[in-house]
């Protein structure tokens, strides 16, 4: 790590901890590397690319769980690799995968923590309750949502543990249902909000407070079911024109027609540049107040392969 004079700590040991007497409070460099929930995009930039950030994030859960040092912090607990669920600085980390476009990894890790690091005995928490946060993580994550950055007003989706839950809110009741839910069917396949197909990997706090129904369809398939928030980041993954699997005038014409109707710039980009790799595909549309397509969601794989 770097010190206050912009120098580098030498020697540096990312596994080391000295309780309340080093650079990290109740943690080490492995845990605090990810503590930028307000600017995940900026953190991604520091890694150099999304792929490199994901690679490092993967390693967090597979490296040794040994905390090195003579007086290590007892708060570094509930370890999976160096992920420390027993202390709050780690609590947002599992949801970074969804923010980085790999929601199945969020689902895997959330289910693992829910089912192995909590139980109904006196020692049922893996760390200090700290004014209720350990329990709050369980409550929110078991509903299938978690507020990664509390000031941002977004609850990111994970993997709901319960088939149905009702939460009393100012606007009435907010109901969350999970169809086909099981230990094996832990991955989100499709989402509906108040009966309409929903294509975001998060829901706003304001929408939760209104009441209504958030419905998940669960399954065993690992998939990206939502539209990426930043489609331009994926543009360089498209194959060159001569490598595309097919080109149909009818398909091109239909895509051009729909793009002319879409008022949302991000969705227009997605529709123009992404196409599912299955013939058995349905596109569901939501409409704006004028009756024009404003949102859509594929029931096939998107964007499992770039065909256009």
Residue ranges: model-predicted function:
Residues 6, 28, 200, 223, ...:
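Short, low-complexity intrinsically disordered segments
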Residues 120, 140, 240-241, 266:
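N-terminal functional modules and adjacent low-complexity/disordered segments of proteins
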Residues 104, 119, 149-152, 156-241, ...:
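Beta-rich accessory regions
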Residues 71, 166, 219-221, 282-285:
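Short, surface-exposed, polar/charged, turn-prone segments marking secondary-structure boundaries
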Residues 241-295:
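Low-complexity, Ser/Thr/Pro/Gly-enriched N-terminal "stalk/linker" regions
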Residues 1-161, 165-175, 206, 212, ...:
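Active-site core of glycosidic bond-cleaving carbohydrate-active enzymes
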């Amino acid at each position: 790590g770097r010190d206050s004079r912009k120098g580098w700590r030498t020697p540096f040991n990312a596994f080391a901890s000295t309780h309340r007497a080093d650079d990290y409070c109740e943690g080490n460099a492995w845990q605090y590397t990810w503590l930028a929930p307000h600017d995940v995009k900026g953190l991604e930039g520091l890694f150099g690319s999304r792929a490199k950030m994901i690679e490092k994030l993967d390693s967090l859960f597979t490296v040794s769980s040994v905390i090195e040092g003579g007086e290590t912090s007892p708060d570094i607990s509930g370890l999976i690799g160096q992920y420390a669920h027993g202390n709050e600085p780690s609590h947002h980390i599992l949801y970074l995968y969804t923010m980085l476009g790999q929601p199945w990894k969020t689902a895997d890790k959330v289910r693992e923590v829910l089912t192995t690091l909590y139980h109904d005995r006196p020692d049922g928490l893996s760390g200090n309750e700290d004014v209720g946060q350990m329990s709050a993580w369980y409550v929110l994550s078991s509903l299938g949502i978690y507020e990664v950055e509390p000031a941002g007003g977004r609850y990111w989706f994970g993997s709901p543990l319960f088939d149905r839950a009702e939460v009393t809110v100012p606007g009435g009741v907010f109901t969350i249902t999970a169809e086909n839910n099981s230990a094996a069917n832990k991955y989100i396949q499709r989402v509906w909000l108040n009966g309409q197909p929903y294509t975001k990997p998060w829901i706003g706090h304001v929408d939760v407070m209104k009441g209504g129904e958030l419905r998940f369809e669960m399954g065993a398939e690992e998939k990206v079911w939502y539209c990426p928030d930043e489609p331009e980041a994926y543009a360089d993954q498209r194959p060159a024109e001569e490598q595309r699997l097919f080109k149909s005038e009818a398909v091109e014409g239909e895509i051009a027609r729909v793009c002319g109707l879409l008022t949302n710039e991000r969705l227009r980009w997605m529709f123009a540049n992404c196409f599912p790799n299955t013939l058995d595909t349905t596109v569901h549309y939501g409409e704006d107040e004028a009756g024009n397509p404003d949102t859509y969601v594929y029931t096939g794989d998107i964007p499992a392969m770039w065909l256009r």
